Amino acid sequence: MRQLAERNACNSLFLQEKNPIDGIFTKFTLFQIDFARISASKPALDAAFTMKLLTDSSCVSRGSACARRALLQRFFCLCLLALLAGCAGLGLGPASTEADPPREFRAMWVATVANIDWPSRPGLAVAEQRAEMRRIIDTARALRLNALVVQVRPAADAIYPSALEPWSEYLSGTQGVAPGADYDPLAEWVALAHAAGLELHAWFNPYRARHPSARSALAPDHLAQRRPELVVRYGELLWMDPGEPDAAAHTLAVIADVVRRYDIDGVHIDDYFYPYPVRSEAGSEQPFPDDASWQRYRATAGWFDLRDRADWRRRNVDELVQAIGRTTHAIKPWVKFGVSPFGLGRPDLRPAGIEGFSQYDKLYADVERWWQRGWVDYLAPQLYWPIAQTAQAFPVLLDYWAGANWRGRHLWPGLFTSRIDASDTSWQPEEIERQIALLRASGRADGHIHFSAAALVQNRRGVAERLAQTLYRDAALVPATPWLRPPDWQPLPAPALRWHCEGALRCRVDAEGAAPAQATMLVITTRRGDHSQWRAITPSAWRSEGLAIDVNEHGAALEAVTLHWLDRYGIAGERRTLTLR
């Protein structure tokens, strides 16, 4: 749906964008023809034709000349549509006619806070932590998932060696104490995930400084010890004050450090911005204690600065969210930035019948603004309610978030798979199956994320087994992010290879030279009559093992093999097709 850069076809894309200043809707139709890799006998030809037709709703009021221009534009549009309808008969097309593999983001969150998913308890030996890590990755592979979202910063701490924050107590049992010598858990997560063909997204909590499950004393280098003026106590929590510029700068520095040092595929933040309200014993909501930062802001505010405290809080969060995306892309343009907010939108924008908590008013998260302005590459709203729950109806919320996706980014809703448990109120696996089926049938979301890994690793009520046999029976590639490409981007060249057959039954395809530096996966498609089958392998597996292909499989003779690389943006490179018949 959002992979026009990869498609060799005649496409039309209808977009509608709301002007964020005056609220006027401007409609336009963008027609794009992209004929790429047309000839198999000479270097690929890249040609593109783009035409924009602007339809101005105020044209009639500006006189007949404008109306005549609009009429001519519409006439030309109809002519172009007729041309597009016949473009398939021009004999232009890719060198290979193989269908592209399906695209769907399939992931699970791996929570480290309170030892929810990994490690299973603090103080585990390194060997046991590694074994649990491998078990999670093996589960993801068996389910044909293609990504993991691993929590690397539970509460202003780290599951990796850091000069900015102390080791997390959820690893060793004591904050600031390394879980083992020469052991970098994040580096191992990245290496193992990539070897298994999985993306690894690093999940940060942007403001939380201490969780109620913590038992260890704060380490001397924890932010609350070094810069106590940046951290406030709120109920059982310690929280970085979003109104303190140095607190936001610290979080940004932590994220930038990880992006620079680790080969991650995504930066991910969850729904904890300003904290969820804490209530007193009497049941009243306690105010968040940010008087000092608010008064400091008011003392220096100019005439046009914000007067409302809620608006100021939302702007504090806005600025950090926008800065995380910009900083991430400035360091590594291909690293995706995603947010997983609470699943309900602003009360004044919600569909009729939707009720519940307002993150806009309580967490000061203006998620619709981030989504509509394209500040995030993907949104994973936590749709943690069953389909039949009317006040938080899953399909209605899906349509709501999809309808606000003006920039054509990825929508990967979060699913509450951990509601499947041993209790009497447990969900049944069918609920998750129906939700995934609904997402696919809608055509408006190209992925989903399970909360959390434990439910799938433990195969609660058989949910993992059922998914593997039905909805995840066939693999899928991660959707591409073509909007992240730099101006000098070029598609990866076709794979260099050697092809030879071992008798009449088996052939081999071996790598010739090194894989391109930007290659993440090699996609191989085999064709036997009308049937095509694809698989993807990592560049390291391709270099070390090559690929063996049965010439005759299930009585069908191999006719052609097509290979292409995927780059860091998930975009398919030039194809090479080997024809046997």
Label each region the model flagged.
Residues 111-131, 202, 207-257, 261, ...:
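Active-site-adjacent "subsite" loops/lids of carbohydrate-active enzymes
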Residues 477-515, 575-581:
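Pro/Thr/Ser/Gly-rich low-complexity, intrinsically disordered linker/stalk tracts
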Residues 158-173, 208-234, 271-302, 349-358:
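Aromatic- and acidic-residue-enriched segments that line the glycan-binding/catalytic groove
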Residues 367-368, 372-389, 407-485:
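Substrate-binding cleft of secreted/luminal carbohydrate-active enzymes
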